[in-house]
Amino acid sequence: IVGGSLGSRTLNNCLMGGLDYFKEQKIQVIWQTGTLMFDACKQAAKGYDNVKVFDFISNIDHAYAAADVIVSRAGAIAISELCLVGKPVILVPFPAAAEDHQTKNAMALVEGNAAIHISDKHAQEQLIPAALQLLNDENKRTTLSNNIKAFAIEDAAERIVDEVFKLIPGVN
């Protein structure tokens, strides 16, 4: 569960309310809370040996590699990382993002059957059941995983550098 570098009140509140469900099904959770809610989330997870709580995960690639399902906001950087990782994803876009770009990002993947979208408004009721359902549906996880990989642009950094150099006079 990743709510971006600052965390997500919505995702944190959903998870705090759903810890028992994950424990019952023996599901391990890696939870990045952000700094603002870290103490409250850490306290809520006390006694849940299946839940590892971090304010920030520096080596997010390791957390992604360990995950069977990823729950995330839908910012551009997160989306690009998730496409490269190729894991099944549930996206809960931040509704106050400029021009609602996170919802647009999420819907591009949803339309390609590459992610599941849950609105921030409905996350409290829908997120935990959707995560549990996806964790228990290997076929759906495989489909989402295969489809999200098609959105990955592995040489994005090189493409950006090439475009920048085109703008600099005298640089080929």
Regions found by a protein language model. Give the residues of each.
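Donor-nucleotide binding loops and adjacent catalytic segments primarily
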Residues: 1-72, 102-106, 111, 116-127
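Short histidine/acidic/glycine/proline-rich micro-motifs that form metal-
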Residues: 5-7, 36, 94-97, 149-150
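Short alpha-helical segment that forms part of, or immediately flanks, the ligand-binding pocket
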Residues: 61, 79-87, 107
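Acidic donor-binding loop of glycosyltransferase active sites
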Residues: 65-79, 87-88
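Short hydrophobic beta-strand element within catalytic cores of glycosyltransferases
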Residues: 72, 88-99
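Two-component system phosphotransfer/interaction surface
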Residues: 123-136, 165
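A short, well-ordered alpha-helix in the C-terminal region of glycosyltransferases
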Residues: 140-154
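C-terminal alpha-helical cap of glycosyltransferases
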Residues: 153-172
